[in-house]
Amino acid sequence: MVYENPDGIRIGLEIHVQLNKLKTKMFCGCSTDYHNAAPNTHTCPICLGLPGTLPVLNKKVVEAAIKVGLALEGEIAEETQFHRKNYFYPDLPKGFQVTQYDYPIVSKGKVVIEGEDGEHVVGITRAHMEEDPGKLVHIGSIGKSKGVLIDYNRSGMPLIETVTEPDMRSPKEARRFLDKFRNILEYLDVFDGNLEGAMRVDANVSVHWGTRVEVKNISSHKGVERALLYEIMRQKNVIRRGGTIVQETRHFDEGRGVTLSMRTKEEAEDYRYFREPDLMPMRITDWIPAIKETLPELPDAKRTRFIEQYGITDMHARALTSKIMLADFYEGVCAKGVDPKIAATWTADVFLGELNYRDLAISSYGGKTIGFIHAKDPEVENSFKGSDMVELVTLFAEGKISDRAAVEVIRTILDGTEEKTPSQIIEEKGLFKAEDDLVTKAVAETIAENAAAVQDYLGGTEKSLNFLVGQVMKKTKGTADAKTARELILKELKG
């Protein structure tokens, strides 16, 4: 199938990612673990840009950038260097940002996503290293702020800025790209996406192959999709009314779901880049072979292996490999000898589904227990033991519990109200599968009490059978096997 793009939509992204798994900042020894710290307590003369200070490059930043480039199948530069990006803004104490200009460390990469018409390649123009500026805290909304506070704890944090080609053709594709890109970074162990401000996105979008508009500094994948949906609609309306799209920078108001004009778009020359005289150019060709040896199994390779090794579906493999810690958790469960297909169903469909419903984000996996935090309140923590999943899968495979019972146990554990094993929860809640004679009795009672539904089914109304099965499940408090109940009902009705 050829994907139609009648509106000529082109979307490119600029993604700023903090290398927050590194211990220290880009050019000084200040800790990167500042998120719960008081303002301006993780600073020093270097990251505050005080006169007379000199930067000392953190080698691990360069190594992490090379890792990212290799994972993106990009070309790693033989020689790379830093530049000064000159502009005045309160969050930039030096009056310039140390970044890379015409010698980026990575160029010409790619990421394969699920597009609107199957697999779709998004080109990577470049990826380069730079330092993060400080953080402005607006008193009130950004458009009506009565004042601004500055926190320099973030100043000097190591960043990778990745620029894509304008290869995405819908907001949904842009979100899928961001999901895949984040997944790759988490597999590389250079990035923790659960931290506030860890990934910020500038989205460039045009319609009818026309003038592009940049929507600046969007902080979530969902926000990027919403901002693009609005901006595409806005541009179409301007053109429909005979107007002209102006090349400009806009801000996305998350609360209102609209983009607002900030300024006309600067050209690169406005920043007057020049080489950073305090940092020497680097030849990094010799670093690459050793770093390549440290690359982990990446998401696409792991997905393919899961399908081949465990015999699971592509859908389950995609879900399980969408988070490195979830993939490790699943493999830990399978290592205990349980049925990998049943384990995939319960982990990918039920467990992950319950996490998403509760707005919980996976935050850790220590080999035995997977931890998670509430996406909107990181102070809310809980965990789920691999041994509990092994026990559940085993009980289900042995026919001792129904699927409803297994779901109830998972929900009870995630609610965090009881420190008990699955067997203890099942025993206390009476969730062990009902004996055959109990199910047979429940089927007979259901048929006798629901004559209208029986007649409807015999008359050709298939959904009435589902109603009857539901009544049996209700009588047995969910302990009957739904498939068995269905078979017994059909046996009775068809004589």
Swiss-Prot record:
It comes from Methanosarcina acetivorans (strain ATCC 35395 / DSM 2834 / JCM 12185 / C2A). InterPro entries: Asn/Gln-tRNA_amidoTrfase_suB/E, Asn/Gln-tRNA_Trfase_suB/E_cat, Asn/Gln_amidotransferase, Asn/Gln_tRNA_amidoTrase-B-like, GatB, GatB_C_1, GatB_Yqey_C_2, Gln-tRNA_amidoTrfase_suB_CS. One of its GO terms (molecular function) is asparaginyl-tRNA synthase (glutamine-hydrolyzing) activity. Pfam families: GatB_N, GatB_Yqey. GO terms for biological process: glutaminyl-tRNAGln biosynthesis via transamidation; translation. Its EC number is 6.3.5.-. It catalyses: L-glutamyl-tRNA(Gln) + L-glutamine + ATP + H2O = L-glutaminyl-tRNA(Gln) + L-glutamate + ADP + phosphate + H(+); L-aspartyl-tRNA(Asn) + L-glutamine + ATP + H2O = L-asparaginyl-tRNA(Asn) + L-glutamate + ADP + phosphate + 2 H(+). Belongs to the GatB/GatE family. GatB subfamily. HAMAP family: GatB. Heterotrimer of A, B and C subunits. This is Aspartyl/glutamyl-tRNA(Asn/Gln) amidotransferase subunit B. Gene3D superfamilies: 1.10.10.410, GatB domain, N-terminal subdomain. Keywords: ATP-binding, Ligase, Nucleotide-binding, Protein biosynthesis. Allows the formation of correctly charged Asn-tRNA(Asn) or Gln-tRNA(Gln) through the transamidation of misacylated Asp-tRNA(Asn) or Glu-tRNA(Gln) in organisms which lack either or both of asparaginyl-tRNA or glutaminyl-tRNA synthetases. The reaction takes place in the presence of glutamine and ATP through an activated phospho-Asp-tRNA(Asn) or phospho-Glu-tRNA(Gln).
